Amino acid sequence: MLNKLIERENLSFEESYELFNVLLNESEMRIAAYLVALQTKGLTADEIAGFAKAMRDNAVKIDLGDVTDTCGTGGDGSKTINVSTAVSIILACFTKVAKHGNVSITSNSGSANVYKALGCKIPETPDDAKKSMDKTNFAFLFAQKYHPALKKIMPVRNELKVKTIFNILGPLANPANPKYQILGVNSSELCDNVAIALSKVGGIKKALVVYGNGLDELTPNGTSKITEYDGKFDTYEVTPKDFGLDYSKIIPCESPDESAKRLIDVFSGKINEDRNFILMNAAAALYTSEIASDFLDGVEIAKEAIESGKVLKKLEEIRNV
């Protein structure tokens, strides 16, 4: 398959699935060659899907029922609060959330970093995650604990210091096999391919793949692109006005501790730019999970959860597991 990639020929879903498993037993040099050849050629939906399905199949198994995930690829280089973590806690007030996350690679506040800064403990085992889900409607699945098969591949990826397919696989490889997912990507071109890949991996009833003017989130200060999947595909653009919100600035964030403090400020009812950023993305997640009928409804549901104290109470439940 390496020669095929060098000739810039695309792999099928089945070939991509096979290649992932081949890489688990290859030398570091050949792993690097495959990853660079694949990236140089350009990734297709079938290749992303084949790798993602193989990554899920090699993951530590966990069954949490019908869950939603809120996760982004990262890699946008932005210094923002961790919106997906805030959204996941709001969402857990209404439905089961399996948040697949990791430590930061390119940002100042990866989801695992912020989760810990919020005073929450990362479940050590699948049984611990199930206990958390049963008690709180929420489980944090720390990626490093669920993908031991990548132990040989990740040092090569890190040493290469260039983008590879693994930069976008994390959100597609949630071992809980989410039924609903809002997934942020770091380039507009990825929206359609990642949505198609999600549909091919299987198990998804509804998903939104979003890109927000340089962010792997919906942006509160401009136009965002969404590719929606619910058995069919639909691509469209939105602005804060579609959510009944004003445009607002994105305030830089310098650390996980700062991100956690600012999330708690919003959960406590503080009205500021962060609130709009979080409400917009929470509304999209509530719509994705079929809790809200549309984005406007999602904003109202999220506002009520914050203003009534439900979200702060949910955070306290998660802290106390």
From Swiss-Prot:
Its cofactor is Mg(2+). Coiled coil: none annotated. One of its GO terms (molecular function) is magnesium ion binding. The keyword DNA-binding does not apply. InterPro entries: Anthranilate_Pribosyl_Tfrase (IPR005940), Glycosyl_Trfase_fam3 (IPR000312), Glycosyl_Trfase_fam3_N_dom (IPR017459), Glycosyl_Trfase_fam3_N_dom_sf (IPR036320), Nuc_phospho_transferase (IPR035902). The keyword Ion transport does not apply. 5-phospho-alpha-D-ribose 1-diphosphate binds at residues 72, 75-76, 80, 82-85, 99-107, 111. Binds 2 magnesium ions per monomer. It holds the Pfam family Glycos_transf_3. Transmembrane segments: none annotated. GO terms for biological process: L-tryptophan biosynthetic process. Mg(2+) 1 binds at residues 84, 217. It is an enzyme of class 2 (transferase). It catalyses: N-(5-phospho-beta-D-ribosyl)anthranilate + diphosphate = 5-phospho-alpha-D-ribose 1-diphosphate + anthranilate. Pathway: Amino-acid biosynthesis; L-tryptophan biosynthesis; L-tryptophan from chorismate: step 2/5. Mg(2+) 2 binds at residues 216-217. Anthranilate 1 binds at residues 72, 102. Anthranilate 2 binds at residue 157. Keywords: Amino-acid biosynthesis, Aromatic amino acid biosynthesis, Glycosyltransferase, Magnesium, Metal-binding, Transferase, Tryptophan biosynthesis. Catalyzes the transfer of the phosphoribosyl group of 5-phosphorylribose-1-pyrophosphate (PRPP) to anthranilate to yield N-(5'-phosphoribosyl)-anthranilate (PRA). Belongs to the anthranilate phosphoribosyltransferase family. This is Anthranilate phosphoribosyltransferase. It comes from Methanococcus maripaludis (strain DSM 14266 / JCM 13030 / NBRC 101832 / S2 / LL).
